[in-house]
Amino acid sequence: YDSVTVGIDLTARDKQAEARANGNPWDIAKGFDNSAPIGKFIPLPEQTPKADNINFSLFINGVKVQQGNSQDMIFHIAYISQFYTLKIGDLIFTGTPAGVGPVKIGDHLEGYLEETKVLDFFVK
């Protein structure tokens, strides 16, 4: 692989709470339409050809709410590739850095890799 991006793994908390209250699995709260928007892919930085030290961040309405680094992944890409065949286009979500919170209709979300904006959308 030679490019990376950011993605957001959204959860419909109302659907999650309803499913939990009824003793049902809550995967519907994770798998709704448009529940995992991803940004545009950009080439890996020359200094991190293995994607193992890349800063990423999320802004909501201009306020930084999350930041992380790919080196903080519990399981790195090399480890994951022992169990799964990875091909160009496969997505690996790194986990959730501190700062998880609600979003609402009209919120403006922007995702960055280092200083490059790769994701930009409004919640509908």
Feature map (PLM): residue ranges:
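Active-site glycine-centered loops adjacent to acidic/histidine catalytic or metal-binding residues
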Residues: 9
